[in-house]
């Protein structure tokens, strides 16, 4: 068994308290029952009479604890699976959050760098614009001082203006390129957002699958519990079947003994019949003739008694008393003569048959069954089935197991008498179920 093992001394040792179940408890109870049978066969029932109720209470308590242990182990396993699932979800979310933060940091860094470039470009353009404005003002002031230099100054102004226009065009192209980059990055951000939404939807789908798996796991555990309950029921039925097999074997042994006795009696009767045919003193009268003679004798005795009573009434009291005494003595003598005559004609077997027939002819006493009528049924009533609906009780499976194991046998095949096993069965079931709860509360 998974919860126990035998050491070198032959003692049963507990392996792991977390692995013990109800089936292990019933196996242990079966082993204890076998040990009790060996002890009772060797030392008798008195050696275990005080220990049996304590052992039964202990096994009931162990059965309750094993059932509670199975429920707690199932609950702990469910909680562990839930914790593992939550931890895996937490790690997945943390990894996804870390990647998302990293991508956001990269995008934000790129945006900062581009923004700084644009700010530097704008500041440089503003400086160039200020320089051009100042240069234009200087040219206008110098044009008032020297008019002769107007043509050359005009050409220089035109060339400078063309140069500024060319630089402005180049700056515009740069700005246009930057705008295009900004639009491109915006599109990329939108694409990343769509990918993020897809990841979220995929995560939701995985969560739904996880819920389905959890539901299937709960269903599997429920089926496992049902299977455990069926195994427990099968163990109890197995114990019932073993007890029934033991009862049947005892009944078979008893029937075999009765058959042997009947065969022996039959042989004795056949032998006595053969001896009676050769016996010269065998009965000369049939049963019917002997019955008629006895009935006729009884009628005559009754008539004599009636006539003596009538005669006593007609005579004086003193003569009636003496006559009555003489009548009693004469009747006794007549009875002795009749008995002697019967003894001379019949043997001892005829006398026994005559006495039996006389007893049959006598009127029945008060409370006795008259001849020709069936006698009332006597003896123990048949046993009621254990699965009768009116016999449902709240006793534990351990008590039922020991009730079947130590049931009162109906034969004498065992080494100890019937009453001892019956006493042991009652002793094993003497402890009330409340004692188990009391002992559990004490622990």
Swiss-Prot record:
Residue ranges of every copy of the RH1 domain listed in the record: 8-96
SUPFAM superfamilies for the chain: RILP dimerisation region
Gene3D superfamilies: 1.20.58.1770
Any GO CC annotation of this UniProt entry: lysosomal membrane
Protein role: May have a role in lysosome distribution by interacting with Arl8.
UniProt similarity note: Belongs to the RILPL family.
Name listed for the protein in its UniProt record: RILP-like protein homolog
Provenance organism: Drosophila melanogaster
Gene: Rilpl
């Amino acid at each position: 068994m998974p919860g126990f093992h035998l050491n070198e001394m032959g003692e049963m040792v507990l392996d792991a308290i977390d692995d013990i179940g109800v089936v292990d408890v019933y196996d242990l109870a079966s082993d204890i029952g076998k040990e009790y049978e060996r002890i009772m066969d060797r030392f008798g029932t008195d050696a275990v009479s005080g220990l049996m109720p304590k052992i039964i209470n202990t096994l009931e308590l162990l059965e309750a604890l094993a059932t509670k242990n199975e429920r707690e182990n199932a609950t702990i396993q469910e909680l562990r699976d839930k914790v593992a699932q939550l931890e895996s979800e937490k790690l997945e979310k943390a990894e996804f959050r870390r990647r998302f933060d990293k991508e956001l940091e990269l995008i934000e860094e790129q945006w900062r760098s581009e923004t700084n470039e644009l700010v530097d470009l704008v500041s440089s353009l503003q400086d160039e614009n200020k320089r051009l404005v100042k240069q234009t003002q200087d040219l206008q002031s110098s044009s008032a001082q020297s008019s002769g230099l107007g043509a050359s100054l005009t050409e220089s102004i035109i060339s400078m203006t063309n140069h500024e226009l060319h630089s402005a065009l180049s700056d515009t192209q740069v700005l246009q390129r930057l705008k295009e980059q900004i639009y491109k990055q915006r599109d990329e951000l939108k694409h990343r957002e769509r990918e993020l939404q897809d990841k979220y939807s995929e995560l939701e789908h995985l969560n739904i699958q996880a819920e389905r798996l959890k539901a299937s796991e709960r269903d599997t555990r429920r089926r496992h519990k049902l299977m455990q309950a069926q195994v427990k029921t099968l163990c109890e039925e197995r114990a019932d079947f073993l007890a029934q097999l033991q009862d049947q074997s005892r009944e078979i042994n008893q029937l075999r003994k009765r058959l042997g006795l009947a065969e022996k009696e039959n042989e004795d009767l056949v032998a006595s019949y053969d001896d009676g045919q050769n016996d010269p003193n065998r009965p000369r009268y049939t049963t019917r003739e002997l019955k008629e003679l006895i009935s006729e004798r009884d009628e005559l005795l009754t008539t004599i008694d009636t006539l003596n009573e009538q005669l006593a009434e007609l005579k004086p009291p003193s003569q009636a008393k003496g006559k009555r005494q003489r009548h009693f003595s004469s009747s006794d003598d007549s009875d002795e003569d009749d008995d002697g005559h019967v003894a001379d004609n019949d043997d001892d077997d005829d006398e026994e048959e005559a006495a039996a027939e006389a007893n049959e002819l006598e009127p029945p006493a008060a409370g006795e069954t008259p001849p020709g009528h069936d006698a009332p049924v006597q003896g123990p009533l048949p046993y009621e089935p254990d699965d009768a609906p009116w016999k449902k009780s709240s006793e534990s499976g351990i008590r039922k197991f020991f009730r079947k194991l130590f049931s009162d046998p109906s034969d004498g095949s065992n080494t100890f008498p019937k009453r001892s096993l019956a006493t042991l069965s009652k002793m094993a079931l003497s402890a009330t179920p409340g004692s188990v709860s009391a002992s559990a509360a004490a622990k």
